[in-house]
Amino acid sequence: QTPETPTIDSLVNVSNERADLARADRLWNAADTLKNILLIVTNADGSEEPLAIGLPGDREIDTRRLEAALYPRVARPFEEADFATHPGLIKGYIGPGALGRKSKSGIEFLTDPRVVRGTRWITGANIKGQHVYDLVSERDFESDGVIDVAEVFDGDPCASCGGTVSLARGIEIGHIFQLGRKY
């Protein structure tokens, strides 16, 4: 039972305050949680379908990376009306068990590359006021694929060279446009 914990911060605080949920080796942090974000994707033909993205709780979706990954489709956040059409999804307590093409909801579930086989997570239990601890990727839940749309932090591994990313301020001194692309 984790009542009144619909946000990552509140979940981490409760997890560290309660003796029955505390870790012996260190405190829980947002990176230990699996955040499941629901979107509505509009396809090129105008049809809409839900999409769920699971990523570590210390990350947010980078909208530019999301747009590039889904292009030419367009995404928007789930709204209250969308939750009304999917009563099995409890806002703030959504877990991967309710997601995926094979699930009852049938909602496509893509995960961040950091959610790899064998990693353990705290995530929603699909019941208001409840979360599941030590849910293991590929053992307790599976995704329908991988999507790399999380914001990038200084020190993250570089996907191209294997080194580490170093973020710095820059200035754009030119811009080349490619015909046929939306800008």
What are these regions (language model features)?
Residues 1-183:
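Extended, low-hydrophobicity, polar/charged segments
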